[in-house]
């Protein structure tokens, strides 16, 4: 049959999403945890598709209330992992059951808390979302390339996330290999609060300060030659070898391939306001001093 005459066709696709892991079925506690996580991360995870993982709770989940809480934070659910009565309840609420698989990439954890000190440990398997977000570099970023500085995946991800541990959750499809990097995107002006720069399929180099409230995101590495006081995410589409480098570390949030840490307290004196790198070691986010 000639498919050119058909009004639709079927194509394979890989979807990535944030896995929201429920540790409690109580709606009040879930909403409070969600509010805190989203407040910590700012706009990092807004508009990222999520898969709800309810396999760790036995008590019945109030699915309509949970879906409303996610909607209030612009987190659209695309599927659920659950068992027994909770699975049926999720179906009744309109959610589609999906299977989670462990693979190369990882997606952001919204509910799980990162341990203290200088490491963040994710929960094993996680989904990723893929869609392109709507936050462009601000007016001062006139040196950013039009295609590379357009939209950040942390907001309408091509990675289902979402804006942290990144393990593929596919919608019944194998994981795609991260694209090859091209020339780095270079920004030579400071980034103010509220500005976001995304380097698609490449590294991001910022020569200047990344202010508190600003976000720098790259599919490859992130280099900040100046104070890093905002949020930084390397390996935005699942590259676990990506790293973050800065000459002065004082960040609000750090993430590599979706494994993230909100920096609520000052880092150790050997790291705070010092040259540092951030990398993944297995499933652990490590922050290390850079020594000459």
Swiss-Prot record:
Amino acid composition bias (Polar residues), ranges on this chain: 171-185
Gene Ontology biological process terms, A to Z: cell morphogenesis; division septum assembly; regulation of cell division; regulation of cell septum assembly
SUPFAM superfamilies membership: Cell-division inhibitor MinC, C-terminal domain
Pfam family, one: MinC_C
Start-end of Acidic residues biased regions: 140-150
Coiled coil: none
Entry keyword set: Cell cycle, Cell division, Septation
Keyword Cell division annotated: yes
Domain of life: Bacteria
Disordered: annotated segments: 109-188
Subunit structure comment from the entry: Interacts with MinD and FtsZ.
HAMAP family: MinC (MF_00267)
Family listed: Belongs to the MinC family.
Protein role: Cell division inhibitor that blocks the formation of polar Z ring septums. Rapidly oscillates between the poles of the cell to destabilize FtsZ filaments that have formed before they mature into polar Z rings. Prevents FtsZ polymerization.
Protein name as catalogued: Probable septum site-determining protein MinC
Native species: Bordetella pertussis (strain Tohama I / ATCC BAA-589 / NCTC 13251)
Gene (name only): minC
């Amino acid at each position: 049959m000639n498919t050119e005459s058909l009004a639709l066709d079927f194509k394979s696709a890989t979807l990535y999403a944030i896995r929201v892991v429920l540790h409690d079925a109580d709606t009040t506690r879930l909403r409070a945890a969600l509010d805190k996580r989203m407040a910590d991360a700012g706009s990092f995870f807004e508009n990222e598709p999520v898969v709800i993982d309810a396999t760790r709770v036995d008590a019945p989940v109030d699915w309509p209330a949970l879906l409303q809480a996610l909607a209030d934070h612009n987190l659209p659910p695309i599927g659920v992992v659950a068992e027994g009565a909770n699975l049926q309840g999720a179906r009744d609420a309109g959610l589609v059951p999906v299977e989670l698989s462990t693979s190369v990439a990882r997606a952001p954890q919204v509910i799980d808390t990162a341990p203290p000190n200088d490491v963040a440990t994710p929960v094993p398997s996680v989904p990723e979302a893929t869609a392109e977000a709507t936050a462009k570099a601000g007016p001062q970023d006139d040196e950013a390339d039009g295609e590379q500085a357009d939209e950040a995946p942390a907001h309408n991800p091509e990675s289902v996330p979402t804006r942290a541990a990144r393990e593929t959750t596919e919608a019944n499809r194998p994981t795609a290999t991260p694209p090859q990097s091209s020339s780095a995107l270079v920004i030579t002006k400071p980034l103010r609060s509220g500005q976001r720069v995304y380097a698609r399929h490449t590294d991001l180099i910022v020569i200047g300060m990344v202010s508190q409230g600003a976000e720098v995101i790259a599919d490859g590495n992130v280099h900040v030659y100046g104070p890093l006081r905002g949020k930084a995410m390397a390996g935005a589409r699942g590259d676990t070898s990506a790293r973050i480098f800065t000459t002065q570390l004082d960040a609000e949030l750090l993430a590599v391939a979706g494994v993230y840490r909100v920096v609520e307290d000052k880092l150790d004196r050997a790291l705070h306001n010092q040259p540092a790198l951030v990398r993944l070691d297995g499933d652990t986010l490590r922050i290390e001093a850079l020594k000459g």
